[in-house]
């Protein structure tokens, strides 16, 4: 059978940054109880977006925070 698509290319991924310990607080929230079956959680990150300076913004839905991650990998809370 003819396949016009190239074979998938394996790309090796590596960790660029992870949430600093000072922002981790494993606990129950109004969000985590129904969404994570009453398990305590540290965060639930989603909604990545970049600005023109290369900062990455992500939303912590569980704790109602927005983080900014600089191109150097430094984390700040922008909204809480």
Which stretches of residues belong to each language-model region?
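Sequence-structural signature of mature extracellular/luminal beta-sheet repeat domains
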Residues: 1-80
């Amino acid at each position: 059978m003819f396949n016009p698509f190239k074979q998938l290319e394996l790309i090796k991924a590596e960790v660029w940054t992870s949430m600093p310990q000072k922002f981790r607080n494993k606990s129950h929230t109004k969000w985590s109880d129904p969404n994570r079956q009453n398990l305590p959680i540290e965060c639930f990150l989603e909604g990545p977006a970049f600005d023109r300076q290369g900062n990455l913004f992500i939303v912590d839905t569980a704790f109602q925070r927005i983080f900014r991650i600089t191109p150097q990998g430094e984390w700040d809370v922008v909204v809480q």
